[in-house]
């Protein structure tokens, strides 16, 4: 997460951002133990590259944990993998906007829309990443958390 953010930091911060690193939240679908590390990675990234201090570090950490936890819930409920995109878009889009709108003197609805639009690319990348890794981990089939065979592709 931190390395990807380092290389994409020119368009990963501010009112208009595409934070490609958030695609990695999708990995929590396959590896639920990543929920806390992804939040911590967001904290460290915002500490190293962000400009809004402790609020951004804590907010990013919370957003990362919530998004990854929602993705784990999607797997536990055995819902479609496509739904992985929803928390990758909405949790950062609506959550980060709560404090960025204040720091950037921008109305919350406008900030939230901007961030949600910017999260669409990482959400698509995240879904594709999970599907590709799943094929490598479970060749010839897709498996849910219970290991039951699924016909969803």
Regions picked out by a protein language model, each given a short descriptive name:
Residues 27-38, 73-83:
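Membrane-helix interface "capping/anchor" motifs
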Residues 1-36:
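Hydrophobic transmembrane alpha-helices
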Residues 9-17, 44-153:
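Membrane-embedded alpha-helical hairpins and interfacial helices in multi-pass inner-membrane proteins
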Residues 1, 40-46:
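Small-polar-interrupted transmembrane alpha-helices in polytopic inner-membrane proteins
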């Amino acid at each position: 997460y931190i390395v990807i953010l380092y290389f994409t930091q020119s368009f990963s911060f501010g009112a208009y951002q595409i934070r490609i690193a958030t695609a990695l939240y999708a990995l929590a679908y396959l590896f639920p133990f990543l929920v806390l590390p992804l939040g911590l990675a967001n904290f460290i990234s915002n500490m190293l590259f962000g400009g809004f201090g402790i609020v951004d570090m804590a907010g990013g950490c919370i957003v990362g944990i919530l998004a990854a936890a929602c993705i784990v819930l999607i797997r536990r409920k055995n819902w479609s993998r496509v739904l992985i995109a929803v928390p990758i878009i909405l949790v950062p889009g609506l959550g980060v906007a709560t404090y960025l709108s204040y720091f950037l003197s921008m109305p919350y609805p406008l900030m939230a829309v901007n961030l949600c639009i910017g999260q669409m690319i990482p959400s698509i990348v995240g879904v594709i990443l999970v599907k590709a890794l799943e094929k490598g981990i479970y060749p010839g089939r897709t498996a849910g958390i219970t290991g039951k065979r699924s016909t969803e592709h």
